[in-house]
């Protein structure tokens, strides 16, 4: 049994990128699905779709690579962990890596990237950073 589905999803995407795989499969949860949709929106992965196999759901993620075959994702890092939750206010999540990276935040408005959370004026739990 997996305790932290977000960490598992980040690790699976990171490992698939290092192996230069086209597609990887993630365990489904609402937060992982929201995370994958943000990664698609920000251009870090090509696409994601939810696959239902009876009762069990999974998410198929198609990875994105640059022209020279290198993964578009340089680093994915889990910030808030089950043993140590990290919360930031709206002013602390304004920019990451001078705008080249994204902070993914779980807010009262749902899971949002840092630019949308800042525009809405909400802070929350920092799930991960991607650049």
From Swiss-Prot:
The keyword rRNA-binding applies. Keywords: Ribonucleoprotein, Ribosomal protein, RNA-binding, rRNA-binding. One of its GO terms (biological process) is translation. GO terms for cellular component: ribonucleoprotein complex; ribosome. Gene3D superfamilies: 3.30.1370.30, 3.30.1490.10. Transmembrane segments: none annotated. PROSITE patterns: RIBOSOMAL_S8. Coiled coil: none annotated. Belongs to the universal ribosomal protein uS8 family. One of the primary rRNA binding proteins, it binds directly to 16S rRNA central domain where it helps coordinate assembly of the platform of the 30S subunit. Part of the 30S ribosomal subunit. Contacts proteins S5 and S12. HAMAP family: Ribosomal_uS8_B. NCBIfam families: PRK00136.1. This is Small ribosomal subunit protein uS8. The lineage of its organism: Bacteria, Pseudomonadati, Campylobacterota, Epsilonproteobacteria, Campylobacterales.
């Amino acid at each position: 049994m997996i305790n932290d589905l977000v960490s598992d999803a980040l690790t699976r995407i990171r490992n698939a990128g290092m192996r230069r795989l086209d597609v990887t499969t993630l365990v489904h949860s609402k937060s992982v699905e929201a995370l994958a949709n943000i990664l698609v929106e920000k251009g870090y992965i090509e696409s994601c779709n939810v696959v239902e196999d009876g009762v069990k759901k999974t998410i198929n993620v198609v990875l994105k690579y640059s022209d020279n075959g290198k993964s578009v994702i340089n680093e994915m890092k889990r910030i808030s962990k089950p043993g140590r939750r990290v919360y930031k206010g709206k002013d602390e999540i304004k920019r990451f890596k001078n705008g080249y990276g994204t902070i993914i935040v779980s807010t009262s408005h749902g899971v949002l990237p840092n630019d949308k959370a800042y525009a809405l004026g909400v802070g929350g739990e920092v799930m991960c950073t991607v650049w």
